[in-house]
Every structure is written in structure tokens, then in C-alpha cells.
UniProtKB/Swiss-Prot annotation:
It comes from Rattus norvegicus (Rat). It comes from the Eukaryota. Substrate binds at residues 122-125, 213-216, 244-249, 265, 275-277. This is Fructose-1,6-bisphosphatase 1. Its cofactor is Mg(2+). Pathway: Carbohydrate biosynthesis; gluconeogenesis.
Length: 363
């Protein structure tokens, strides 16, 4: 008789999880369709990433995207996969991608009620050296009764109904944030399904790791450099923080989520508005952080409170464990006190409901 003991027979897959949440909400099923289609794209990208060398997908395609990054062959493939799968979900009306100058308006016969902003392959500069890369996405509900347009994507992050990222590393992990929490799913290649491995994830109140590209230190605001020095040489003689930086936002943020600490990509003299894009990098990751009990700020305001004016808008980013971010803001506010009043320290807003709650209405 065959021993099936090593195999779990009642596994919680992402599809099952979404269907259960949809049943609880009594929803229409559109969000389920959208997430299932997005997962199919992520599985295909995961496979392409692992076969890139054999399939000759490494290298540069000979062009740059709208934000000035050199476009890699995997970028193009990933972008096409996400766009085509989201179109075929019949759940979206507007798509915003890092790779496209303008928003993509879905054909009338395929339209649904959701707006999706995404970076199909974050950290693509790391492709050739095999470092971890990822896909980032944020999902909004269309709020106007007009014909779909680019303006439908210009919503603050507080309006997100779901957001998350896929990390293509030693395994493929999908982190999905909704109003009811943050859940992590790992791709099991043997059955081709994402399996729930961490439910209702919470970030530590305080970590011991900071993540920033110190190569830009000479162009940083003095408050940034002061904070970094305090992490290296604590004034109270406590243990210094460890420095970790991959250069792929998804990889650096996921480590911060798992271990606690702080991730910084601040503005500098060369990039006074920051470098990361608000709609498809900052907002989705900030949403994940807040739903996990952390904080995400520009230094001057919560990232999720920014009302965007254009789809490729940039923003500074400081996010992570609550106590670490608050410590940064104390230093930042003190440094700026001469020119403006100090800002109140934000509190964790993980339990606040956005305008539209995925667990209340969406499926």
C-alpha cells in the first residue's frame, strides 16, 4: 500500500482562500477572476525567470521604458503576460504599467470595474546577476461613472482594495494584502498552486536592520545621514543595526517585512522627488506595510495619503517597523524644525478601512 503521509490532503491554496473570502462577502466574483488571472501571469513569469539563461531572455532589448530604465527582455515578456492575463479576466477597465507611457484602456467588451497599477518586473537591473526580482501590483475600484481613462488611476493609496507583490527568489512567494490582513502564499511547483504559508502577517514593532543605498550619501538630506550614523553608532551604546541592501525593492521590502527594521529610498539632490514610482511601487508596498502593522511615509506625509497628479509620479519612501520609522521621523522633524513646524508622528493605521474593502464587497 502506498504511503501518502508526506502529502497534505487539505491544503489552503490562493484560489481556495480567495473563493472563501468571496463567499463570506457575497461578492460578484470579479475580484476572484482578477486575482486568478494575475496569479497565472505570476506563475508564467516565475517559470520564465528560472529559464531565462536557457531561453536567452537575459540581456537588453535595445530600448528604455518611460522612467528611463533600460528594458530587459524579461521585462517585455513579463509586461505582456500581465497585460494579457488581466485583459482576459474581464474584471479590469484601466491598466497602468511601468513599461508603458500611457494607461491602457481595456476594450469595452472585456471591461470590468477594477483599475490595476503594476510593475511587471521590479529590480530588473539585477536579472543578469541572478539576484531576486519581483512583480508589484495595486488594485483600485473605478470610482467615476464616465468612460474609463487615465484619470481613474489617479487615486490615493487609501483607496486600494488589494495590493501585493510576487518575489522570485529561492522560491516564488506571493504576498497579498487586503483590508482583512496580509497573507503569504508560496508557489508549489509540483502542483502549480500558491499555498498559504503565513496567515495575517505582522511586522515587528522594532527591528535591527536598515536598508538603504548608501552610495548616494553625499546627496542625502542631513537628517538621512544622521539617522544612518545613529544606526551604525548608537548613542546609547546598544548593538548597531545590520545593513542589508539588494537593490530590488521587492527583495529589500520582503526582508524588512519578515525580520523587521526599516527600508529607505529617500529623495536626494539628484532626485528631489524621490526615484520610486508612486502608483505601482510606493502605494502597493506601503499598503502591505500598513496592513501588517508598520508605517510608510515620505518624511512629510503618509505615502497612502498622496493624491497623484500623473501616473508615473515619484515619491520618497521610508517604511518598516513602527518604532524604527518613528525614530527616523523624530530626527527628520528636528532637522527641519528651523524651516517649518514639526509634523506629528503617525501611528500604525493597519486596522483602518480604505474607501473600498476587499473583504466587504469585491469578490
Amino acid at each position: 500500500m502506498v504511503d501518502h503521509a508526506p502529502f497534505e490532503t487539505d491544503i489552503s491554496t490562493l484560489t481556495r482562500f480567495v473563493l472563501e473570502e468571496g463567499r463570506k462577502a457575497g461578492g460578484t466574483g470579479e475580484m476572484t477572476q482578477l486575482l486568478n488571472s494575475l496569479c497565472t501571469a505570476i506563475k508564467a513569469i516565475s517559470s520564465a525567470v528560472r529559464q531565462a539563461g536557457i531561453a536567452q531572455l537575459y540581456g537588453i532589448a535595445g530600448s528604455t521604458n518611460v522612467t528611463g530604465d533600460q528594458v530587459k527582455k524579461l521585462d517585455i515578456l513579463s509586461n505582456d503576460l500581465v497585460i494579457n492575463m488581466l485583459k482576459s479576466s474581464y474584471a479590469t477597465c484601466v491598466l497602468v504599467s511601468e513599461e508603458d507611457t500611457h494607461a491602457i484602456i481595456i476594450e469595452p467588451e472585456k471591461r470590468g470595474k477594477y483599475v490595476v497599477c503594476f510593475d511587471p518586473l521590479d529590480g530588473s537591473s539585477n536579472i543578469d546577476c541572478l539576484a531576486s526580482i519581483g512583480t508589484i501590483f495595486g488594485i483600485y475600484r473605478k470610482t467615476s461613472a464616465n468612460e474609463p481613462s487615465e484619470k481613474d488611476a489617479l487615486q490615493p493609496g487609501r483607496n486600494l482594495v488589494a495590493a501585493g507583490y510576487a518575489l522570485y527568489g529561492s522560491a516564488t512567494m506571493l504576498v497579498l494584502a487586503m483590508n482583512c490582513g496580509v497573507n503569504c502564499f508560496m508557489l508549489d511547483p509540483s502542483i502549480g498552486e500558491f499555498i498559504l504559508v503565513d496567515r495575517d502577517v505582522k511586522i515587528k514593532k522594532k527591528g535591527n536592520i536598515y536598508s538603504i543605498n548608501e552610495g548616494y550619501a553625499k546627496d542625502f538630506d542631513p537628517a538621512i545621514n544622521e539617522y544612518i550614523q545613529r544606526k551604525k553608532f548608537p548613542p546609547d551604546n546598544s548593538a548597531p543595526y545590520g545593513a542589508r541592501y539588494v537593490g530590488s525593492m521587492v527583495a529589500d521590502v520582503h526582508r524588512t517585512l519578515v525580520y523587521g527594521g526599516i527600508f529607505l529610498y529617500p529623495a536626494n539632490k539628484k532626485n528631489p522627488s524621490g526615484k520610486l514610482r508612486l502608483l505601482y511601487e510606493c502605494n502597493p508596498i506601503a499598503y502591505v506595510m500598513e496592513k501588517a502593522g508598520g508605517l510608510a511615509t515620505t518624511g512629510n506625509e503618509d505615502i497612502l495619503d498622496i493624491v497623484p497628479t500623473e501616473i508615473h509620479q515619484k515619491a520618497p519612501v521610508i517604511m518598516g517597523s513602527t518604532e524604527d520609522v518613528q525614530e527616523f521621523l523624530e530626527i527628520y522633524n528636528k532637522d527641519k524644525a528651523k524651516s517649518r513646524p514639526s509634523l506629528p508622528l503617525p501611528q500604525s493605521r493597519a486596522r483602518e478601512s480604505p474607501v473600498h474593502s476587499i473583504c466587504d464587497e469585491l469578490f
